[in-house]
Amino acid sequence: MARLQEFYKEKVVGDLTAKFAYKSVMEVPRILKITLNMGLSEAVADKKIIEHAVGDLTKIAGQKPVVTKARKAIAGFKIREGYPIGCMVTLRGAHMYEFLDRFITVALPRVRDFRGVSGKAFDGRGNYNIGVKEQIIFPEIEYDKIDALRGMNISITTTAKTDDEAKALLAAFKFPFRN
């Protein structure tokens, strides 16, 4: 079992139950999934970019991402329907907790001028989104072997009903909030 998963069951559930006065253990919010999404607008010109991005995301997440395709044609962006324009991977269970552990303890401190993540990036339904500008903050990516710096969106989906509950859940996992 992953370190954060054990920590959740042993400590976080009890703390959140006391803080929010839940009647049942099943009411305590938990993380459902973590989605990593990489949008690649420059992939229209060169198909190799998708392959490199898939390789990077595979190393970061530990499982193979799905290539996302354009749903409809947009002439202004020179995109036709069905063109590969990004890749995404959804993590659940043990993989999700392992990734979250690496993200909080190793990757986030490697961000340049890091002062904490914003506490206002919740969507109103208890889910949290964070943008990463460079994939090299992850230790699995070797700086010498990348072709370009790419960012990604990391979306953490929880069962929390409010943003306050979700923030308390992530703060219990030692998420470095700025405010």
Swiss-Prot record:
InterPro entries: Ribosomal_uL5, Ribosomal_uL5_bac-type, Ribosomal_uL5_C, Ribosomal_uL5_CS, Ribosomal_uL5_dom_sf, Ribosomal_uL5_N
SUPFAM superfamilies: RL5-like (SSF55282)
Domain of life, per lineage: Bacteria
NADP among keywords: no
Quaternary structure and interacting proteins, as annotated: Part of the 50S ribosomal subunit; part of the 5S rRNA/L5/L18/L25 subcomplex. Contacts the 5S rRNA and the P site tRNA. Forms a bridge to the 30S subunit in the 70S ribosome.
A GO molecular function held by the record: rRNA binding
Record-given protein name: Large ribosomal subunit protein uL5
Classification lineage: Bacteria, Pseudomonadati, Pseudomonadota, Betaproteobacteria, Burkholderiales
GO biological process: translation
